[in-house]
A protein has these predicted regions:
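Active-site donor-nucleotide binding/catalytic segment of nucleotide-sugar enzymes
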Residues: 264
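Conserved nucleotide-sugar donor-interacting segment of glycosyltransferase catalytic cores
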Residues: 99-162
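Conserved N-terminal ligand/cofactor-binding loop architecture of enzyme catalytic domains
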Residues: 2-98, 145-258
């Protein structure tokens, strides 16, 4: 809503989505964008050797450990059950991402970068580039209180150091404070959301219908979807569902769920 208002700034966006929602973003009138980049349109399966000299120079220029980013990317390594990336593929993807992000920052010279909590290496890479180039970053993430978010430059770290003396006391006792905390229970918020989604047969059928009946070529154009097809995804979901049931059964049979009151 507030981004629709004209405050004298220009809005640019890097859009990281599969192929299906792309038409919506191309036609949307909710937000006026001066420039937009569809991230996966710029990352290709080239088959060419990566430019190691460029990557080394990039690391020195920005003081960013690219190896650390890729090693911690679940898509590239053992947590990906659908596709095994070669070292050259990983480095080629990284090279294209670095060049794309440098081009974008050089072109628009942003004053601010607004992002959700970075979940993939390429998101965190752009975040680090902005930080190194003194671009103000605003990261939005869930707080320890349910139904509340925090905006700061670093995750789980406020941009200021509030002092207790700056807050007016409401003279609540411990139990009242505990009740207040429980009223914003983040665990309950997540559980309620999961139950709403998991218990909705209509949404499950709708998702299955979209997956099996509509064509989506993201597995050919998006490296995050490489190796996926309908039969593999179905087989994978069945396998994971069986594993989940087995583990739940094991936990219920073998682990205590009640902590003795006097146990230290």
């Amino acid at each position: 809503y507030y981004f629709q208002k004209d405050f004298g700034y220009e809005i640019n966006a890097i859009i990281d989505i599969p192929n299906k929602p792309k038409k919506f973003f191309q036609k949307q009138k909710l937000l006026k964008l001066k420039n937009s980049w569809y991230f996966h349109d710029h990352i290709k399966k080239t088959g060419q050797k990566p430019d190691l000299e460029y990557l080394n120079n990039f690391e020195r220029k920005y003081q960013i450990n690219l190896q650390q980013l890729t090693i911690n990317e679940r898509i590239f390594y053992r947590f990906n059950d659908f596709y095994k990336f070669s070292s050259d593929e990983v480095l080629s993807i990284l090279e294209q991402e670095c060049k794309l992000f440098e081009t974008i920052v050089d072109e628009i010279k942003p004053n601010y970068f607004i992002t959700p909590l970075t979940a993939f290496h390429h998101q965190h890479l752009f975040y680090e580039i902005c930080r190194k180039r003194n671009i103000k970053t605003l990261m939005i993430y869930m707080s320890k209180f349910g139904h509340r978010c925090v905006i700061s430059q670093d995750v789980n770290k406020l941009d200021f150091n509030p002092k207790l003396s700056h807050f007016q006391s409401k003279n609540r006792n411990f139990n009242q404070l505990l009740d207040y905390f429980k009223s914003f229970d983040i665990v309950k918020q997540i559980d309620d959301y999961k139950k709403k989604i998991e218990n909705s047969k209509f949404k499950k059928l709708q998702a299955a219908n979209n997956f099996f009946l509509n064509n989506d070529y993201s597995n050919q154009t998006h490296y995050t979807y490489y190796g996926r097809n309908r039969s593999k995804v179905l087989s994978h979901e069945i396998k994971k569902s069986i594993q989940l049931r087995k583990r739940r059964t094991f936990i219920k049979k073998n682990l205590s769920r009640i902590i003795p009151e006097k146990q230290k």
